[in-house]
Amino acid sequence: MVGLQPSEVPPTTVVKFLGAGTAACFADLLTFPLDTAKVRLQIQGENPGVQSVQYRGVLGTILTMVRTEGPRSPYSGLVAGLHRQMSFASIRIGLYDSVKQFYTPKGTDHSSVAIRILAGCTTGAMAVTCAQPTDVVKVRFQAMIRLGTGGERKYRGTMDAYRTIAREEGVRGLWKGTWPNITRNAIVNCAEMVTYDIIKEKLLDSHLFTDNFPCHFVSAFGAGFCATVVASPVDVVKTRYMNAPPGRYRSPLHCMLRMVAQEGPTAFYKGFMPSFLRLGSWNVMMFVTYEQLKRALMKVQVLRESPF
């Protein structure tokens, strides 16, 4: 690495792993209220006659939550969300390039679209398997108003939520919804990582952009839109199933069929706008931060290894 500029040094797997988790946490801090609004809109109508608060639109949902539950309510579940990103994004994003290289035949300069999709599915599934308990707790906190009676909080804190779910529903309760979540995140990871990878590659090959902020911004925005379109139906089913009390749904398929019967097919795109606003803005913030963090971390590494 001696004599190379930081931008010329390929980032190590450790740099990508740490950079992805840190960048994802930063993006979560800025976009978490949109994710909470998405969850509230997705579960609206799930249990007719019980819900007293009606949510309309992204901004309306956030304002209603602030008015009825307090100004901190849009950030309910943030701690679990940060737990999730450090374990989830680090794997699905940080290991993507390494897994892609593993699947690419030796002697091949470029990975095919099929190889990239396979790598995205692999890291997405690995990430869900490790991070599912954090996702369950995050969703429970975001949907807290619907649990219990009289607006009382069921969990005293994030660690108490892990313990309570394990005690009342068994350890399997912490992995509730794993299969729909694996499906959802395999789709999202493919849409995000593969789309970002391809758009960025085409922009650089066509010399429309250099490897800088505008290139990262356009690539990330396109990745966020594609991910929202293809993943929304699975995301709604995942949210409903993970938030449901024991016995409401026999399986994710039963949840999906009940949604169609009671609310129609448009239920699969409930919360689409906050999903897009969240995924679009989240992808832009995450990928831009991730690219800069990789460069900064490699610069530090080059300086440490330089003899001068």
Curated annotation (Swiss-Prot):
The keyword Signal does not apply. Solcar repeats lie at residues 11-102, 111-202, 211-296. It comes from the Eukaryota. PROSITE patterns: SOLCAR (PS50920). Residues 275-297 are annotated as: Purine nucleotide binding. Coiled coil: none annotated. Residues 33-73, 134-179, 234-267 are mitochondrial matrix. Residues 1-10, 97-116, 197-213, 291-308 are mitochondrial intermembrane. SUPFAM superfamilies: Mitochondrial carrier. The chain crosses the membrane at residues 11-32, 74-96, 117-133, 180-196, 214-233, 268-290. It is found in: Mitochondrion inner membrane. Signal peptide: none annotated. InterPro entries: Mit_carrier (IPR002067), Mito_Metabolite_Transporter (IPR050391), Mitochondrial_sb/sol_carrier (IPR018108), Mt_carrier_dom_sf (IPR023395). One of its GO terms (biological process) is proton transmembrane transport. GO terms for molecular function: oxidative phosphorylation uncoupler activity; proton transmembrane transporter activity. GO terms for cellular component: mitochondrial inner membrane; mitochondrion. It is a multi-pass membrane protein. Keywords: Membrane, Mitochondrion, Mitochondrion inner membrane, Repeat, Transmembrane, Transmembrane helix, Transport. Putative transmembrane transporter that plays a role in mitochondrial metabolism via an as yet unclear mechanism. Originally, this mitochondrial protein was thought to act as a proton transmembrane transporter from the mitochondrial intermembrane space into the matrix, causing proton leaks through the inner mitochondrial membrane, thereby uncoupling mitochondrial membrane potential generation from ATP synthesis. Interacts with HAX1; the interaction is direct and calcium-dependent. This is Putative mitochondrial transporter UCP3.
